[in-house]
Amino acid sequence: MSGELNGNDTSAQAAVSAGSVLEGAAFADEGEQHNESMKTLVLGALGVVYGDIGTSPIYAFREALHAAATNGILARSDILGVVSLIFWALTLVVTVKYVLFVLRADNNGEGGILSLMALVRGALKGRPDLILGVGICGAALFFGDAVITPAISVLSAMEGLEIVAPNLTPFVVPAAVVILVTLFSVQKLGTGRVAIVFGPIMALWFVALGASGLWHIFDDPTVMAALNPYYAVRFLTVSPAVAFVTVGAVFLAMTGAEALYADLGHFGRKPIVRAWLWIVFPCLLLNYFGQAAFILSHGEAAALPFFQMIPSFALWPMVLLATAATVIASQAVITGAYSVARQAVQLNILPRLEIQHTSEKLHGQIYIPRVNLLLGLAVVILVLGFEKSSNLAAAYGIAVTGNMLVTTVLLYIAMTRIWNWRVSRALPIILGFLVIDMLFFSANIIKVHEGGWASIGIATVLVLIMWTWVRGTRHLFQKTRKAEVPLDLIVEQMAKRPPTIVPGTAVFLTGDPKSAPTALMHSLKHYKVLHENNVILTVVTASKPWVASADRARVSQYNERFMLVTLTFGYMQQPNIPRALGLCRRLGWKFDIMTTSFFLSRRSLKASVHSGMPLWQDKLFILLARTASDATEYFQIPTGRVVEIGTQVNI
C-alpha cells in the first residue's frame, strides 16, 4: 500500500511539473501585458470560458458508460478504459492541441473560427473561396453548438431532481423550459451586472467537482491506474465496435474546448491557460476519476453517477449549483453567438443585423435581437423534442467535432503560411490532430439517426443562408457595376455642363469608389443639382479585429467639388460613420454633421433567371436582403441627415 501511495505522490509531482513545463511552453513567446490583475482575469475566464466544458461531468461519463456497457453489464476494464480515454482525450485535445498550438493562432489578439478564417485568407493570395467555405462551415457548426449547449446543459442539471425527489421527474422538462425562456428574455438587459458573479460561482463549482471526486477516489484508489494509456488502448482494441461507439460519447467531455480559442480576445492567452492548467483540468480529472471509483465500488450507480455520488445532505445544494453553472455555461455560449454573428456581418457572410450595445463602458457587450429570438426558439424546440439530455448527446458531438476539424485544417495553413513552418515540421503535428479529430467525428457522425440529424440540419440551413448571401452580394455587385458609370466620366460631363450648385456637403456611400454612386446619378438626373462639397465614401472591413483610430480614415481630394474618403473598421468593431468622419478633421476636412446630408441607395431586388444562381437561391437572397437591418441604423447615421433614393435591380 505504501508503494502505491508513494507512486501516486510521484505522479502528482510529475503532473505539477508537467503543468509547469506546459505553461512555460505556452508562454514561450508571450509578450502581452494585461492592465487587470492576473487573478481577476483567471476568475473571469472560469466564468466565461470554462462553463461549457466544466458542466460536462454531469452527463459525459454517464453517456460513455452507457455506450460501453455490453447488455447493460460493465466490466472493471470497461470503466477503467472509459476514464482513461477521457483523461487522454482531455490531455491531447485540450492541453496539447488548444493550449500549445491553437491559442497561438490569434488574429491581433482575437480568436474564434471566423478570426482564424480571416487570418488565413489574408495570408493567401487571391483569398480563395475554399477557405471562405471552410470558415462558413465552421461558423455554422458553432451556431449549432450554441443551440445545443443550453438545451443539454440545463436539462442535465434539472435531471438531478430525479435523484433528489423522484416524484419531481415530470417537472424536469417544464422547469428547463422556464429557466431557458427566462434566460433568453433577460438578454436585452445586458449581462454586465450579473457577469460579476459568474467567476466566483464557477470557481465554487470547480471546487465542488474536485472535492466530490477526490472524496470518492478513496472508494477505490486503484482507479488511478487508468492514467496509464494501456487501459485506453486495451479498451479500443479488445472490442473495436463497442469502443468506436463509446469514443463518440467520450467526446462529450471535450465539448466547450473550442471556447478557449473563441474567448481569446476577452482574457488573453495567459489567464486562459493558467485557469485550465491549475484549476479546470485538475478538478475535471478528479471528478471523472471519482465517478469511476464510485461506480467500481457501487456497481448499480451507473444511471446518474454524478448526482448519485453526492451525499444526501448536499444533493439540493449541488442541484442548485449545477443549475447555476449550466445557466452560466449557456450565457457564455449565447454571448459567443452574438460575437460570431457580428463578425459574420462585418465579414459580409450574413446580412446586416440590428446590434444593441448593453453597456456604455464595455463595447463588447452586445445584444442582437434576431439572433436571440431564433436561438431561443431553437433551444426550446430541442428541449421539448428530445426531453432528455441523453437524447441530445448525439446531436451535441457532431457540431463540436466538426468545428474542431475545421480548426485543425485552418491551423495547418496558419502554421505553414503565417508562422512559416516547414511542411515537414507542421504536417506530423497536424496529422496527429486530424487522426484524433476524424476518430471523434466519425464516431459521432454514425449517430445521425439518434439525434445527430438536428446538428447537421441546423448547420446545413446556416451554411445555405451564409453561402447564398455571399454569392448574392457578389452577383449584385457585378450586376450594378456593369450599369454604373465611371466617376471620371461624370466629372468630365459636369465640367462641360455644370449643374446647379447648392450649399452644404453630400456624402454618397458606395462599394466602388471608381464608379459614380447610384444615389449621385439619380440626384443629377432628377434634381439637376450638385452640392458644394461631395464625398464619395467607401466603408471597408479589415481582415483583423481592430483598427486604430489613427488608421480609420483615408482622405484624398479628387477635385474642387469631390473628395474620396475610405473608412476602415475591424471585423469586431461596430461602424459609426459620423464619429469616424469626425476623425477627418486632422486630415484637413472639417466635417460638420449639421451641414451634411447622407445619400443612400435603397435597392428593390427582383429575381431573374439569368442571375447565375438558381431561382430559389435568388428568392432566398432577396428575402435575406429584405430582412437586413437598415443601413442608417447599422452605420449609426442620424436619420434626419439621410436621403434615400430607391432603385430596382434584377439579379
From Swiss-Prot:
Q: Where are the transmembrane segments?
A: 41-61, 82-102, 130-150, 163-183, 194-214, 235-255, 276-296, 309-329, 366-386, 395-415, 426-446, 450-470
Which GO cellular component terms, listed alphabetically, does the Swiss-Prot or TrEMBL entry include?
plasma membrane
Q: How does it sit in the membrane?
A: Multi-pass membrane protein
Reaction(s) the record says it catalyses: K(+)(in) + H(+)(in) = K(+)(out) + H(+)(out)
Identify the keywords attached in UniProt to this record, alphabetized.
Cell inner membrane, Cell membrane, Ion transport, Membrane, Potassium, Potassium transport, Symport, Transmembrane, Transmembrane helix, Transport
Record-stated family: Belongs to the HAK/KUP transporter (TC 2.A.72) family.
Q: Which function does this protein serve?
A: Transport of potassium into the cell. Likely operates as a K(+):H(+) symporter.
What is the protein name stated in its UniProt record?
Probable potassium transport system protein Kup
Provenance organism: Brucella abortus (strain 2308)
Which gene name belongs to this protein?
A: kup
